[in-house]
């Protein structure tokens, strides 16, 4: 126990791990002189896992390993298995074409490196980029010995945990292939981060029972606004397969803009407590890897009936937002609807249209006026966000390039054009409107919150920024520093505790103004990166504390229910709230300009669109006539605050987990790509300094690596923390944070996925 001025906390050391939350570990199999073992990829497991004789190969049923709960000791009849290689006819690069998920008929099997029985595969395991449940198990005639597993990647179940002087033991559940084979890195990440990647039979059954189209006389349409006559479009990336959102903008007669944001009504098909719902909650989010994805929902829904595909009817939850010519929100309406997307647009195509590219303009001539209105409104909304202090870090993100065979060919900066900003602004506006409505009604909901930064993080950033001549322009609270008295004397260096008096007075404006000052400067990249690191992570919570980075008093996630479980929860709550109000809700925020005699819920929008019905009046009329009212908004459900609290914790953890898996796979692919560049020189930015050396980021490839002091052979270098520099004792040559230098790649550490550089002379 440690205490300081009445503040106490418990500290200790982990002595022995008696059991792990996850019993499976992925690693590389090694044949040793005394025993066979697996070296885990998870660096938190620093020991080998011994694989006893007879446990080297999976128990197999129809080509799949048994689940861990069913795996027993190896049967005597199961002999060691030889692993098929490329020379034996198994081609890991081959991708068998799959059918469209809406086309009847069986799915062809898809395999990478495994001999899998076609009859055991569901569509979910081989369409849409999901893991196929690989198991490289060959027929009995080709079984040989455990040496065929040497250097292969396997997934093992821990059967005996480590004890003093005794290594843990385990058995092989799956053989994934060789590390360098196509797709094996994704399989490793899926298992390392324990991402659910096979839909259980009850989930498959529910997904298969989902309708493929919406009947014209579907009772669900009676209480929905009909938007099928409007040229509504989706705008997504070129490789997107699921479309959550569709948009449309029109100019009203009095000069205001009317923004339509239509979001897939996933709650209509994924009901609370169903097998689909339980699996979606378990996954929490879709996980996107560079070459494929692990979806939250089966493809019959995510790419089928829920996806806002072009030229087909789809159920939606709609947000209609009216903005005045200054971009102020004056009124909004939330309601269920039905749309028929006119076109599946890409960011690139919209960019070309806005730039006046002839081919794009000719192809989409009928939609050009609408895209021009979208551009106008998005610029107004961006300016309004900037005026209130919203922070926008335009940091480059890497994008992996592949050839037609799936081989990685390069790393480039992902393009971010104004078409991305259009969708971003429209989704932000819809999310804020939904959050504002639910909070205004006092309805418990799930918010997307971003708290103020921690004072220590801000102080650390201020100290670094000062070396560049910059500051956030804030007044730091006074600090008290005291040395901790430790009972455990094994700590070599004294440790201190700092306490700050008073609250840190900081606002998004401080960050925004500094970001604007840095724009175009040499130090922009490094200081923007450090500013971002000083902020807390956004998360989900039932308690609304606002969103610091967006400078928004209330915010939620509503616009991506196909790939995020919190959005699905918000849809259910919103539908339950709207059902109490007769099916829709209209809110006036500010008194705008122009004709205010009619609300947006009573206007006819667009040629060919019928005047919207009044669902309350229709329901009352049906009741008066003795007709039983139709069910109101299927999938609607309020959620208890205690359950919302649990959901906030679960979904925030799922999001972090997915981000870690995506980030680590990107590092794996970068290291694999750089293997062919050992000895090459690169321009680099110094992004971090420690006593042992400095970290660099390659300017053109967005690849990070380390330059150890031992590789600086021209002098004896010392790290000066106060100066944020590494300086040669004799030459006085300095390497400072944010400076650019030229480096040479000298070594790749595959086991830890690290790159080592030296300074190029």
Per-range role (PLM):
Residues 1-100, 108, 115-260, 267-312, ...:
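Charge-lined substrate channels and their catalytic hotspots, especially those that engage the 3′ end
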Residues 1-2, 156, 689, 743-745:
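A generic structural signal for residues embedded in beta-strands
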Residues 32, 252-253, 323-328, 402-405:
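Short acidic-glycine loop/turn motifs at beta-strand connectors
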Residues 47-49, 165-167, 180-184, 243-245, ...:
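Short helix/loop capping segments that flank catalytic or ligand/cofactor-binding pockets
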Residues 100, 110, 128, 589-603, ...:
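Arg/Gly-rich low-complexity intrinsically disordered repeat tracts
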């Amino acid at each position: 126990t440690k205490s300081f001025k009445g503040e106490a906390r418990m500290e200790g050391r982990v002595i022995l791990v008696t059991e792990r939350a996850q019993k499976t570990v992925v690693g590389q199999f090694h044949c040793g002189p005394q025993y066979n073992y697996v070296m885990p990829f998870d660096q938190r497991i620093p020991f080998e896992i011994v694989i006893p004789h007879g446990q080297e190969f999976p128990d197999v049923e129809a080509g799949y390993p048994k689940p861990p709960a069913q795996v027993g000791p190896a049967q005597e009849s199961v002999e060691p298995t030889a692993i098929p290689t490329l020379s034996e006819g198994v081609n890991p690069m081959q991708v068998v074409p799959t059918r469209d998920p809406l086309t009847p008929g069986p799915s062809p099997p898809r395999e990478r490196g495994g001999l899998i029985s076609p009859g055991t595969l569901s569509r979910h395991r081989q369409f849409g980029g999901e893991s196929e449940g690989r198991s490289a198990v060959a027929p009995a005639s080709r079984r040989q010995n455990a040496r065929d597993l040497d250097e292969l990647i396997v997934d093992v179940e821990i059967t005996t945990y480590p004890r003093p002087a005794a290594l843990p033991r385990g058995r092989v559940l799956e053989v994934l292939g060789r590390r360098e084979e196509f797709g094996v890195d994704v399989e490793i990440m899926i298992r390392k981060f324990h991402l659910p990647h096979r839909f259980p039979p009850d989930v498959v059954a529910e997904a298969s029972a989902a309708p493929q189209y919406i009947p014209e006389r579907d009772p669900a349409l009676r209480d929905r606004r009909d938007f099928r006559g409007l040229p509504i479009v989706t705008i997504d990336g070129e490789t997107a397969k699921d479309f959550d959102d569709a948009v449309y903008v029109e100019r009203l007669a009095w000069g205001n803009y009317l923004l339509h944001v239509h979001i897939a009504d996933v709650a209509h098909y994924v009901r609370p407590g169903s097998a689909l719902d339980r699996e979606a909650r378990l996954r929490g989010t879709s996980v996107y890897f560079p070459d494929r994805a692990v979806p939250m929902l089966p493809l019959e829904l995510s790419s089928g009936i829920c996806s806002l595909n072009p030229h087909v009817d789809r159920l939606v939850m709609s947000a209609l937002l009216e903005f005045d010519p200054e971009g102020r929100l004056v009124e909004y309406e939330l309601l269920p609807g039905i749309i028929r997307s006119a076109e599946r647009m890409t960011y690139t195509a919209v960019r070309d249209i806005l730039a006046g590219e002839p081919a794009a303009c000719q192809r989409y001539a009928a939609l050009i006026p609408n895209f021009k209105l979208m551009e106008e409104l998005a610029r107004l909304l961006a300016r309004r966000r900037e005026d209130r202090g919203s922070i926008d870090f335009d940091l480059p993100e890497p994008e992996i390039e592949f050839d037609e065979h799936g081989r990685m060919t390069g790393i480039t900066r992902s393009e971010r054009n104004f078409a991305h900003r259009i969708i971003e602004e429209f989704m932000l506006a819809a999310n804020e409107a939904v959050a504002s409505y639910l909070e205004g009604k006092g309805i418990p909901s799930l918010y997307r919150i971003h708290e103020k930064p921690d004072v220590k993080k801000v102080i650390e950033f201020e100290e670094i920024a000062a070396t560049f001549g910059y500051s956030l322009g804030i007044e730091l609270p006074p600090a008290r520093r005291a040395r901790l008295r430790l009972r455990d004397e094994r700590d070599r260096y004294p440790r201190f505790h700092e306490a700050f008096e008073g609250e840190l007075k900081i606002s998004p404006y401080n960050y925004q103004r500094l970001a604007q000052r840095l724009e175009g400067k040499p130090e922009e990249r490094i200081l923007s990166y450090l500013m971002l690191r000083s902020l807390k992570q956004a998360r989900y919570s039932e308690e609304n504390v606002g969103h610091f980075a967006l400078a928004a008093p209330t915010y939620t996630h509503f616009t991506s229910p196909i790939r995020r479980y919190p959005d699905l929860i918000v849809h259910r709550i919103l539908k339950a709230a709207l059902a109490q109000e007769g099916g829709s809700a209209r809110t006036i925020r500010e008194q705008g300009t122009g004709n205010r005699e009619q609300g947006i819920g009573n206007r006819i929008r667009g040629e060919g669109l019928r005047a919207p019905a009044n669902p309350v009046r229709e329901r009352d009329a049906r009741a008066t006539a003795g007709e039983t009212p139709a069910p109101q908004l299927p999938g609607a459900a309020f959620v208890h605050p205690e359950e919302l609290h649990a959901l906030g914790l679960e979904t925030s953890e799922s999001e972090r987990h997915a981000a870690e898996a995506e980030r680590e796979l990107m590092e794996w692919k970068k290291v694999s790509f750089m293997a062919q560049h050992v000895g090459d020189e690169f321009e680099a930015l110094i992004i971090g300094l420690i006593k042992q050396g400095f970290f660099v980021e390659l300017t053109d490839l967005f690849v990070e690596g380390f330059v150890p002091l031992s590789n600086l052979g021209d002098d004896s270098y010392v790290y000066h923390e106060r100066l944020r520099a590494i300086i040669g004792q004799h030459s006085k040559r300095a390497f400072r944070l944010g400076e650019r230098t030229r480096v040479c790649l000298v070594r790749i550490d595959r086991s830890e996925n690290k790159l080592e550089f030296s300074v190029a002379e």
